[in-house]
UniProtKB/Swiss-Prot annotation:
GO CC aspect terms: cytoplasm
Upper taxonomic lineage: Bacteria, Pseudomonadati, Pseudomonadota, Gammaproteobacteria, Enterobacterales
Family: Belongs to the Maf family. YceF subfamily.
Main location: cytoplasm
Pfam families, A to Z: Maf (PF02545)
Keyword ATP-binding: no
Keyword Protease on entry: no
Top-tier EC class: hydrolase
Recorded catalytic activity of this chain's protein: N(7)-methyl-GTP + H2O = N(7)-methyl-GMP + diphosphate + H(+)
Name used for this protein in its record: 7-methyl-GTP pyrophosphatase
Organism: Escherichia coli O6:H1 (strain CFT073 / ATCC 700928 / UPEC)
Keywords: Cytoplasm, Hydrolase, Nucleotide metabolism
Catalytic site positions: D69 (proton acceptor)
Site (Important for substrate specificity): W12, Q70, E154
Cofactor needs: a divalent metal cation
Amino acid sequence: MPKLILASTSPWRRALLEKLQISFECAAPEVDETPRSDESPRQLVLRLAQEKAQSLASCYPDHLIIGSDQVCVLDGEITGKPLTEENARLQLRKASGNIVTFYTGLALFNSANGHLQTEVEPFDVHFRHLSEAEIDNYVRKEHPLHCAGSFKSEGFGITLFERLEGRDPNTLVGLPLIALCQMLRREGKNPLMG
């Protein structure tokens, strides 16, 4: 049975994969994440997830390698990590009363036989109308400077939302586990069977 590799250094993705109670290792993929001018958000996350998984194949020749990538889209534009408090406030002002869509690309690459499975999972976050004071308090309390969209849904960010829509809530954090379990079963690795 091939071993499992998570092509990511994200502590959030690692924590999500640990929910499946299967043995895995993490490795950092070497991928240029620059978007191409002709790529849609869906195409971007699909390409990057695939490249991340395949980039580790030579180092891990008989493994199942998981690649994942996510973008946050508001008004048709990709919204990155804010990095500063002012940018976080600006992103939250734009999101207030709107729908933010997260696209998460997932790839599972079997480096032993070259079989690749891919999927893109959308997830919609419906923001309630936020006051300036709420935005300021949220940024001060949660400090979401390294989170796309300027919030942490698994934390205090839940207070910003009116509704969440998607097949798998794990998608919003960065790794669609329902889709991943389906892919793993197709490769003969059922998380419920060890």
